[in-house]
Amino acid sequence: MLIPTAARKTLAVIRILNGAMGLLAPEKLLGRLGVDTAQDRSGAYPFRMFGIRTVLIGLDLLLLRGAELRRAEKLAVLIHAADTVSATVTAARGDLPRKQGLMAVVISAINTTLAVTAWKGGQDAVTAHEVVPQSH
């Protein structure tokens, strides 16, 4: 069984690496989706645009603590569930070649599973404030 902390850190690393690839080598990501970048490089812009966002939300999962981390974990579920729905619709419509479409669905579903695992584990976490009540 995957523990929540490992799920969160794994998802963070995936986000950081994918975001960095989007920023620095969008053509590689486009190629993995079956796009001939010699003919069409229009996808480079959105990959770069979302690359920095993806890096930052990955860093949030590594660096935030307490309530801020719980919020980031909760948002990760929404983000990756939406990605999975988007990948599924894209594959079903044939907007990507079959193999790449199915791979996008599988990858998105794995990320959603990691996000849910991290979020559920975070719900069970007890904050220091709850353990040691603060008197003011």
Residue locations for each model-derived region?
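Short amphipathic, positively biased membrane-proximal segments
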Residues: 1-136
